[in-house]
Amino acid sequence: MPNSILFLLLSFLYLTNCVAQSPSQTCPLDFSHVLTIPWNTTDCQKSDKSADSKNSCCQSLLTLIGIPLAHRLKQTSNFRLPNLATSISCLNNLQTKLSSLSLSSNLTSLCFDPNQFVINNETCAGIQTTQDWVSRLGPSTALDSACSSGLTDLTRCDACVAAGFRVQKQLITLDGNSSHGVYCYHFVVTYAAGIVNKKGPESDDALSCLFSLSLRSPLNSKKKRHTVALALGITGAIFGALVIAGLICLYFRFGKAVKGGEVGWEDQGSRPKWRPNTGSIWFKIEELEKATNNFSQKNFIGRGGFGFVYKGVLPDGSVIAVKKVIESEFQGDAEFRNEVEIISNLKHRNLVPLRGCSMVDDDSESQRYLVYDYMSNGNLDDHLFPRGETTKMPLSWPQRKSIILDVAKGLAYLHYGVKPAIYHRDIKGTNILLDVDMRARVADFGLAKQSREGESHLTTRVAGTHGYLAPEYALYGQLTEKSDVYSFGVVILEIMCGRKALDLSTSGSPNTFLITDWAWSLVKAGKTEEALEQSLLREEGSGLSNPKGIMERFLQVGILCAHVLVALRPTILDALKMLEGDIEVPPIPDRPVPLAHPSYRMDGNGFTISPALSGLQIHSGDMLR
């Protein structure tokens, strides 16, 4: 019996000693922010339904882990967790928070390998601590001046992201293994959010720019903001109610006097009258009905933005195109007036001129019409991608070159030739019309938006066309001149490649869906000729081949303009100079993922590129800057 007791005692002491020597499984990361930050849980709610949702969900979760890692870096100088047991414990803690939000109980195991958060000497240039960072890169880097504050401003965020990629490049050079680029980028993000940014990892600066976390609503870090917003809202509501009441009174007093007539029209016979303050002609509806044969099907020539377009002939013999505006989700009286006011004051040879307009109100609906000069050669899209049995000769290289330059000049005028600048927001083939000489003119300013100098727009209503929308605008409503540059880049690629912006017929690699990814991958692989429209590579009737070097330059400018990062796109003026050969085209940059990109996921062997990067749905990581 004594021997049995001694054996049990020794066994107990042995097990106690083993537990004491085993690594601690207590997680040092605080995940309380998972419940306080208004992050968008939509993709995580349906992560089991599509690969895209899963990738977006995993991206959000990676950011939620990155926030406390940045906090810990500042507190302990350690970039990652000490061992596998700690990493597993932290992922379990995160999963507990996610489950409390009624999300799936296996999200962390679905998205992560615990090893990816454990530090080791081979992660990135042997860096484990901030001391290692300083010893490798020096006491300061480009991040220190670019990422310290003010990152909610798009321009400053651009500069910070560009600095991040420069530092990443330094780290990859030091490491010597380009496959570690993703890990190095995560280190850059963690350092910028935890050490450099003055407001910290949970600030608006870090969440909106560094981590690019998709939020349900803007962050308000102080209760005072809520109070002020509530007070302003109540005041605005009261004022709005008074204004509406006044308008109702005016309507009942004066409404009958104008009901059923053209707005802004004075009955002075059949001659059109110049409307004050705009310079555009206001037609009577009877004139437009006569010109278009009562908007007959025979005169119908296509559908443009927000309406149907009819060909017409005025009494003086001039041919016009009349757009009959139809009500839609985006268009109303305010936007119609906006279009008239903007277009009527624009005069440039590469813009479609507005001849006039008409607006009729009756009991059932408002009818609005825009009158343009008729462009006899239709739109660019019809020439690039003929429909049905229509046969058109492929555009020649001189024609393609001329069209690209014309569009660039038209956009340069909108961005720099008028004050305030105008952003078109819907540059695409169907909005580029061709006159009798095949010169291009930018059309359809129904979505145009004026800008105050030096400003970027933030809007909750994104307008435009899928495949041409700049990612930062499509995802976050951040509108700048570079948004038009992105769309212009896509149009260049369509012209040079003879391929649609979104090619849904393509099978195989998801990289082939988007023309931007497809063209970039071929050019980076040294297969530029495979990206060019085949008709451009054949010799013309004269026996002379097209200038391959110039065509490649145009293709490279298109890729550069359509880069997912705002900071790496040129302005339209610089793009025009590159096209004309006045300045050199910089080397085509990689399409690097922004800070914490959803397209990277872990498989059994390490990080791989996810098909979501080039899928039809663009996610928060695809865009930034």
Swiss-Prot record:
The active site is at 426 (proton acceptor). InterPro entries: Kinase-like_dom_sf (IPR011009), Prot_kinase_dom (IPR000719), Protein_kinase_ATP_BS (IPR017441), Ser/Thr_kinase_AS (IPR008271), SPARK (IPR043891). One of its GO terms (cellular component) is membrane. Residues 1-20 form the signal peptide. Disulfide bonds: none annotated. It is found in: Membrane. This is Probable receptor-like protein kinase At1g11050. It comes from the Eukaryota. It catalyses: L-seryl-[protein] + ATP = O-phospho-L-seryl-[protein] + ADP + H(+); L-threonyl-[protein] + ATP = O-phospho-L-threonyl-[protein] + ADP + H(+). Keywords: ATP-binding, Glycoprotein, Kinase, Membrane, Nucleotide-binding, Receptor, Serine/threonine-protein kinase, Signal, Transferase, Transmembrane, Transmembrane helix. ATP binds at residues 301-309, 323. Gene3D superfamilies: Phosphorylase Kinase, domain 1, Transferase(Phosphotransferase) domain 1. GO terms for molecular function: ATP binding; protein serine kinase activity; protein serine/threonine kinase activity. It comes from Arabidopsis thaliana. Its EC number is 2.7.11.1. It is an enzyme of class 2 (transferase). The chain crosses the membrane at residues 228-248.
